[in-house]
Regions:
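Sequence context surrounding c-type heme c attachment/ligation sites in exported
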Residues: 34-38, 63, 127-137, 156-165, ...
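Axial heme c-ligation environment in periplasmic c-type cytochrome domains
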Residues: 51-57, 73-115, 148-154, 172-197, ...
Length: 207
């Protein structure tokens, strides 16, 4: 039986507000980007499918979201210790090309832990009215594909350990500079550890 799963990671996740699809000027070149990602493969996999849970999978991620994240990391707006210095010598066009490369790769879908399935599905599709938690589908779509024009990320197949950390960082306020409207912070603040883990597992198997 196939389940269509997903989560609130407007994380890993950022939203800068809705916008149009990337203009010709904004678009990068995937073939050029392929030549720039060799150093990225150690953590994110050769094709963007991470093999280690703590590192996010980038394969199939929305172009606009990827580009926004790379720009934030390079400018210091999003601090990731492991990424320190990694983008310093790259131009903005390089960031566009890298984003284009990963956006056209096929993401790998994982398996949902059975004991987390029901809670994760309920939260993702219905939210929690008593706690004021909205359904994740509003921004991330029923299949976890995100919203490319609005720069809301693809969640389908994302690594559960990474999603768990992202949501906990939103909840604590550690991850705040990338989301001016504080939507993810407000949502994550209302989630307990059990709910976060259920959502993280759920999105890993979402398709």
């Amino acid at each position: 039986m196939r389940f269509k799963l997903s989560i609130i990671f407007i994380s890993s996740i950022l939203l800068t507000g809705a916008g149009d699809a990337p203009s010709v000027k904004e678009k990068g070149d995937a073939e050029t980007g392929k030549q720039l990602v060799s150093a990225c493969s150690a953590c994110h996999g050769a094709d963007g499918n991470s093999l280690a849970g703590i590192w996010p999978s980038l394969a199939g991620q929305n172009y606009k979201y990827l580009l926004k994240q790379l720009r934030l990391v390079k400018s210091g707006g999003r601090e990731i210790v492991e990424m320190t210095g990694q983008l310093d010598n790259l131009s903005d066009q390089d960031l566009k090309d890298i984003s284009a490369f990963y956006s056209v790769q096929n993401n790998v879908i994982g398996q949902v832990e059975k004991d987390k399935l029901e809670l994760g599905r309920k939260l993702y599709y219905s939210g929690n009215l008593e706690k004021g938690v909205p359904a994740c589908t509003a921004c991330h779509s029923p299949r976890g594909l995100g919203n490319a024009p609005a720069a809301y990320p693809l969640l389908s197949g994302q690594q559960p350990d990474y999603v768990t950390k992202a949501l906990k960082d939103y909840r604590s306020g550690e991850r705040s500079n990338e989301d001016p409207s504080k939507i993810m912070i407000a949502i994550a603040y209302k989630l307990d550890d059990n709910e976060i883990e259920a959502l993280s597992s759920f999105v890993h198997g979402l398709h």
